[in-house]
Amino acid sequence: MCDTFYVRSHKDTGSTAFFAKNSDRDPNEPQCMVFVPKGSISEPGTYVKLPPYKVKYDVWLSRPSWMWGAEIGVNSKEVCIGNEATFNKLPVEKSGVLGMDYLRMALEQASTAFEAMNIIIENTLSFGQGGDGGYEHP
């Protein structure tokens, strides 16, 4: 299971905000650090291709090498998101849109956490969610 935490900055002490996440990905899976500049054209989707759009904000991502989406990232508006794995017994589409794809879409388009949340919700309602996110053991 993933562990994600956030520590708020404090104006009185001058402390810095921290956002961190460990990864529960397969141990042999390569992760890439990727910079996506604003103004570039994003063509989202690991398994299901979604409509392309223009990236609104610079984004820094850590993502599995084979996947379009990301495990964790932050954009130039200081919006940060970490993917959390869910385990359930409900059937899922084998080739659906991954949660990590939605994470990247939100970071490339949102200027606030609230906006990022709405982007994820709206896209999930429009395109669904599913797909196999495993590397060695799908």
Residue ranges with predicted function:
Residues 1-99, 119-138:
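A contiguous strand-loop segment
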Residues 100-101, 114:
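A structural signal for well-ordered alpha-helical segments within the folded catalytic domains
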Residues 102-109:
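Second-shell loop/turn segments in exported
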Residues 109-117:
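Short, charged, surface-exposed loops that flank catalytic or proteolytic processing sites
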